[in-house]
Amino acid sequence: MADIDKLNIDSIIQRLLEVRGSKPGKNVQLQENEIRGLCLKSREIFLSQPILLELEAPLKICGDIHGQYYDLLRLFEYGGFPPESNYLFLGDYVDRGKQSLETICLLLAYKIKYPENFFLLRGNHECASINRIYGFYDECKRRYNIKLWKTFTDCFNCLPIAAIVDEKIFCCHGGLSPDLQSMEQIRRIMRPTDVPDQGLLCDLLWSDPDKDVLGWGENDRGVSFTFGAEVVAKFLHKHDLDLICRAHQVVEDGYEFFAKRQLVTLFSAPNYCGEFDNAGAMMSVDETLMCSFQILKPAEKKKPNATRPVTPPRGMITKQAKK
C-alpha cells in the first residue's frame, strides 16, 4: 500500500493536463507506480461508495470516451475542469482510441481528488474479457506491462454500476434488464465482480433500446437484449422516475432521445475511431433537473478515403423522422 501513501495527485493531474494545446496524440508517460497507486486508491473509494450511486444536481453527464484523450480534455474545457463542475461518466473509458491510459488515469485522479463531486460508472469495456481484445491490453503491454493491465482489472471490478440523480434520473451504461424489478437488486450486487455473460449486471452494461421492438428482443451484439418504448415507460412509472440516461451506442448528434424523450443516449467521443462524423455530447442537469446538451462538433479533417462509404458499426443509431 506504499503506492497510495506517497501518491502525489496534484502532480499527476498537472502532468496529464500539460499536453492541453499540444497536437493531439502526444502521450503522457506517468511512472508505473503512480498508475498502480491511482488504481489502488480509486478502488478503495469505489468500494467505500454505493454500487448504486445517489447523486444530486447540478452535474454534467458524459457518455463513452474510448481512449480519445484529447476529446476528453475538450469536454472539460467546455464543461469546466473539476471542481468547477460536478461530473458523472457512464463508462467505456478504454479501448478503440489511442490513449486509453491517459484517459483512465486522468479520470481516476479526479475521482481521488474530488471523491464527492466526480463519479465514474462501469461500462462494458471496463471488463477484462472485452478490453483484452479491443485495445487496452495491447496499450498497457506496449507502454508498461501486463501486470499493470491486471491491476486495472482489479480496479474496474469495483466500479459502481448505476446512479440515480435526485431520485428522478436513472443512469447506467447500457440499459434496462428483464430481471430488474427493484433497485435493491442492484444494491445487492457484491464487488469486486467480473461482468457475467447474462443476468442483471450484464444487461445494465450491454442492453440497447430499439424502436422496432415490443417488449424485449434479441440483441445483434450477441449479448443481452433490446427493449422497446413500452418497457421504458413502465420502468419509469413503477420507480417514479422521469428519465433514463445511458450511453453505449454511437449517435450522430452526440445525444438522441427515445420513447418520447423518456430515454436519452449520450455519446461523448466525436469522430469516433476516426471513422464517423458523429458529434460528441455532454448533458448538463441543473438544480431544477432541466437537461441541456453541450455539443463537441467532430473535428474538421480531410479523410484519406473521403469517397468511400463507411461501414457502420453494430448498434449505430441513425437519425430518423419519427412516424
Curated annotation (Swiss-Prot):
<comment type="similarity">
    <text>Belongs to the PPP phosphatase family. PP-1 subfamily.</text>
</comment>
<dbReference type="GO" id="GO:0044877">
    <property type="term" value="F:protein-containing complex binding"/>
</dbReference>
<dbReference type="GO" id="GO:0016607">
    <property type="term" value="C:nuclear speck"/>
</dbReference>
<dbReference type="GO" id="GO:0051301">
    <property type="term" value="P:cell division"/>
</dbReference>
<dbReference type="GO" id="GO:0000781">
    <property type="term" value="C:chromosome, telomeric region"/>
</dbReference>
<keyword id="KW-0206">Cytoskeleton</keyword>
<dbReference type="InterPro" id="IPR029052">
    <property type="entry name" value="Metallo-depent_PP-like"/>
</dbReference>
<dbReference type="InterPro" id="IPR031675">
    <property type="entry name" value="STPPase_N"/>
</dbReference>
<feature type="binding site">
    <location>
        <position position="66"/>
    </location>
    <ligand>
        <name>Mn(2+) 1</name>
    </ligand>
</feature>
<keyword id="KW-0496">Mitochondrion</keyword>
<keyword id="KW-0378">Hydrolase</keyword>
<dbReference type="GO" id="GO:0098978">
    <property type="term" value="C:glutamatergic synapse"/>
</dbReference>
<dbReference type="GO" id="GO:0019904">
    <property type="term" value="F:protein domain specific binding"/>
</dbReference>
<comment type="function">
    <text>Protein phosphatase that associates with over 200 regulatory proteins to form highly specific holoenzymes which dephosphorylate hundreds of biological targets. Protein phosphatase 1 (PP1) is essential for cell division, and participates in the regulation of glycogen metabolism, muscle contractility and protein synthesis. Dephosphorylates RPS6KB1. Involved in regulation of ionic conductances and long-term synaptic plasticity. May play an important role in dephosphorylating substrates such as the postsynaptic density-associated Ca(2+)/calmodulin dependent protein kinase II.</text>
</comment>
<dbReference type="GO" id="GO:0005741">
    <property type="term" value="C:mitochondrial outer membrane"/>
</dbReference>
<feature type="region of interest" description="Disordered">
    <location>
        <begin position="302"/>
        <end position="323"/>
    </location>
</feature>
<dbReference type="GO" id="GO:0005977">
    <property type="term" value="P:glycogen metabolic process"/>
</dbReference>
<dbReference type="GO" id="GO:0019903">
    <property type="term" value="F:protein phosphatase binding"/>
</dbReference>
<dbReference type="GO" id="GO:0032922">
    <property type="term" value="P:circadian regulation of gene expression"/>
</dbReference>
<dbReference type="GO" id="GO:0046872">
    <property type="term" value="F:metal ion binding"/>
</dbReference>
<keyword id="KW-0131">Cell cycle</keyword>
<feature type="binding site">
    <location>
        <position position="124"/>
    </location>
    <ligand>
        <name>Mn(2+) 2</name>
    </ligand>
</feature>
<keyword id="KW-0090">Biological rhythms</keyword>
<dbReference type="GO" id="GO:0098793">
    <property type="term" value="C:presynapse"/>
</dbReference>
<feature type="binding site">
    <location>
        <position position="64"/>
    </location>
    <ligand>
        <name>Mn(2+) 1</name>
    </ligand>
</feature>
<keyword id="KW-0995">Kinetochore</keyword>
<protein>
    <recommendedName>
        <fullName>Serine/threonine-protein phosphatase PP1-gamma catalytic subunit</fullName>
        <ecNumber>3.1.3.16</ecNumber>
    </recommendedName>
</protein>
<feature type="active site" description="Proton donor">
    <location>
        <position position="125"/>
    </location>
</feature>
<feature type="binding site">
    <location>
        <position position="248"/>
    </location>
    <ligand>
        <name>Mn(2+) 2</name>
    </ligand>
</feature>
<dbReference type="GO" id="GO:0019901">
    <property type="term" value="F:protein kinase binding"/>
</dbReference>
<dbReference type="GO" id="GO:0005739">
    <property type="term" value="C:mitochondrion"/>
</dbReference>
<dbReference type="InterPro" id="IPR004843">
    <property type="entry name" value="Calcineurin-like_PHP_ApaH"/>
</dbReference>
<dbReference type="Pfam" id="PF16891">
    <property type="entry name" value="STPPase_N"/>
</dbReference>
<dbReference type="GO" id="GO:0005730">
    <property type="term" value="C:nucleolus"/>
</dbReference>
<dbReference type="GO" id="GO:0046822">
    <property type="term" value="P:regulation of nucleocytoplasmic transport"/>
</dbReference>
<dbReference type="Pfam" id="PF00149">
    <property type="entry name" value="Metallophos"/>
</dbReference>
<feature type="modified residue" description="Phosphothreonine">
    <location>
        <position position="307"/>
    </location>
</feature>
<keyword id="KW-0963">Cytoplasm</keyword>
<dbReference type="GO" id="GO:0005634">
    <property type="term" value="C:nucleus"/>
</dbReference>
<dbReference type="GO" id="GO:0032991">
    <property type="term" value="C:protein-containing complex"/>
</dbReference>
<dbReference type="GO" id="GO:0043197">
    <property type="term" value="C:dendritic spine"/>
</dbReference>
<keyword id="KW-0597">Phosphoprotein</keyword>
